[in-house]
């Protein structure tokens, strides 16, 4: 059979046994990739600093997904939250990876078995003796089983009734840990940032799936609907399955990029909107002001800011700063964060406190402008020194650090002040190690960006696939070139072509 590459899947079109076989083999490949990728990531992952070098800075992709489902310990003796452990149990990162690889091997063997033993009785229609599948019944079975899995996940795994729970954190990604979740049955359950909605929605959707599955197992579709939607054609199944997949891909691309309870910032990094809105900056200032209200000094107030919170307020952790074709982890870009230098506060010779205007997300370069509390420009680093009025030298800007490694240190020489003003454009200032990984200083995206880009791209491709296969199954007779006024009853055989002498026909 001389098939072109884009039509090779027609070999399983009317062969249920081998159709099942190739799907099992596909599952083997997916599971094998997941397990192998997990082992690779574990081989290169450095768990020593969960605050300044978390998994998302290291470009980990599958470790965050395992972690959000409750895996936190490694057979290597470390925990994702820091510290050492003695008894990680079987469901460690390596245990989950191994289970996927074992499952992949079993699926591989099952796929071979079904390829060899393709002509099973279960695939034969008793009336005709030909291979056929009762697709509406199979739909009911799959709906029922997926409903059971969905309900079980929400009612047992997430709630901790039989399972670890899921990763839950505070709004600023500081206190995350795996814990059981109670379902949220009120309006708050529809808030995408409320973890309880994950439990309640899985329970509700699972219940609906079980009931819908039982319905489709016990009720046959009407003949007109069966014919209108081509329910007897396997390509209808392909088209509707692709629709389900691309819809899910669009949804998860959204929940990942905009953030939700399912994509914690401790595991996937912050979102770009948290930088755009000054989300962490506002919380830092709120905490500092609260400290000052308790009669703490400026230095003491800033010293109480956790490094983790300060690190989120750094543009290098913004997933939108990485280019699409800049391969590698964030650590390969601006380097491995070593420590927080502290918060710089700039002042001019008149005593005004100055704030450096921060770089917007989609700028690579941005003018250094310092404004006072009223937004009035007081100082800058001019492009043309001959026309400058507000240069650091003319205005007499000084900088003093509060909190961090440089706490209490001040500088008044213009070159140093300008250096820290440029760095303050990028948020809180960190010492970054570029030597270890030979980092090039160009920002990279986090796994949040890669996941979103990948799923949005494939969702678009799968959307066209749904249209393509849906059109093929709905207009199959048109594409085959059949005259609608044909007065002969044609039975489509192997070739399904009009004028083919092997196609049986009967004059009406």
Curated annotation (Swiss-Prot):
HAMAP family noted in UniProt: PSII_PsbB_CP47
Entry keyword set: Chlorophyll, Chloroplast, Chromophore, Membrane, Photosynthesis, Photosystem II, Plastid, Thylakoid, Transmembrane, Transmembrane helix
Residues that span the membrane, as ranges: 21-36, 101-115, 140-156, 203-218, 237-252, 457-472
Cofactor binding summary note: Binds multiple chlorophylls. PSII binds additional chlorophylls, carotenoids and specific lipids.
Biological role: One of the components of the core complex of photosystem II (PSII). It binds chlorophyll and helps catalyze the primary light-induced photochemical processes of PSII. PSII is a light-driven water:plastoquinone oxidoreductase, using light energy to abstract electrons from H(2)O, generating O(2) and a proton gradient subsequently used for ATP formation.
Name of the molecule in the record: Photosystem II CP47 reaction center protein
Assembly and binders: PSII is composed of 1 copy each of membrane proteins PsbA, PsbB, PsbC, PsbD, PsbE, PsbF, PsbH, PsbI, PsbJ, PsbK, PsbL, PsbM, PsbT, PsbX, PsbY, PsbZ, Psb30/Ycf12, at least 3 peripheral proteins of the oxygen-evolving complex and a large number of cofactors. It forms dimeric complexes.
Record localization: Plastid, Chloroplast thylakoid membrane
Record-level GO BP terms: photosynthetic electron transport in photosystem II
Annotated Gene Ontology cellular component terms: chloroplast thylakoid membrane; photosystem II
Family: Belongs to the PsbB/PsbC family. PsbB subfamily.
Domain of life: Eukaryota
Membrane topology type: Multi-pass membrane protein
Gene Ontology MF annotations: chlorophyll binding; electron transporter, transferring electrons within the cyclic electron transport pathway of photosynthesis activity
